[in-house]
Swiss-Prot record:
The record marks A87, E88 as: Cleavage. The modification Phosphoserine is found at S95. GO terms for cellular component: azurophil granule lumen; cytosol; extracellular region; Golgi membrane; mitochondrion; nucleus; perinuclear region of cytoplasm. The keyword Cytoplasm applies. It is an enzyme of class 5 (isomerase). One of its GO terms (biological process) is prostaglandin biosynthetic process. This is Prostaglandin E synthase 2. It comes from Homo sapiens (Human).
Amino acid sequence: MDPAARVVRALWPGGCALAWRLGGRPQPLLPTQSRAGFAGAAGGPSPVAAARKGSPRLLGAAALALGGALGLYHTARWHLRAQDLHAERSAAQLSLSSRLQLTLYQYKTCPFCSKVRAFLDFHALPYQVVEVNPVRRAEIKFSSYRKVPILVAQEGESSQQLNDSSVIISALKTYLVSGQPLEEIITYYPAMKAVNEQGKEVTEFGNKYWLMLNEKEAQQVYGGKEARTEEMKWRQWADDWLVHLISPNVYRTPTEALASFDYIVREGKFGAVEGAVAKYMGAAAMYLISKRLKSRHRLQDNVREDLYEAADKWVAAVGKDRPFMGGQKPNLADLAVYGVLRVMEGLDAFDDLMQHTHIQPWYLRVERAITEASPAH
């Protein structure tokens, strides 16, 4: 396979955990899920998509149901253990972040990797970055899971690998709030094999938008059930809808596609030959693929309009009475939406988004909050 094809295959669809889906247009918002349903709902495909008559995802739904049982088992085990935790955390537990040595394997221009960096920076978690070559991917040869982001967390003698951006974020947030061992926390987000609409086996993760907290901890973080539900809903929206608007917009025209791949090559880890081939042949390939994505996701003729509508819908959800969805500080949904949009910075799509929607004040507030909290890493 020539370098350009390998780069395109790495960056679309799977190398960045960017699994573009065939079939109907994803719903911009998902119905409220009960806690018991998150093993199979928040971690897997929507019930509507799974139930579509004749869909190959019926097999995936069955697999997720089996995996969901495992998730419920771990959730029940967590609940029993949570009852034994002390209500007050010791001073040592307040400095949990200092115990972790984190290494993030990423593509800098991947929206899912950007989400994780936004979370780590806002929570002042120092980490090392390993930029993965999208052609050879030798940097992650240690892992059977071949998508990025991958986060390796070293805690004393224990080393844990966390996969999937939303699992990474939920697991680390649970760790910071509850003080539970990270080794135990990651068992609450079981990996499950499923078959997507293209008939390809994929890995889904149960409970990935759920923080494993007891009632007191949840009250401390959210203040109420509505805030928790809202955060989870919009985190999933960022993954299931917003992220799928990026490629059709940044590769919308040949000129934009070339500018996007110029940025990818400059920011990524490419050899001289790989970079030159990727810039021109990759741009041409992704320009054509963007047209398929436009049709696949049932976007408007002018795909900018879908991006604008998504941004304004998000701004409306945040509302005028609070600076962030999280209130006075960004929550996980704020960080997810910001992380996805940030990968377009410097491109025409980003400039148009800032000019033609009301999202810029919120975006700059999140950027400032992250900058003020971020440590050197």
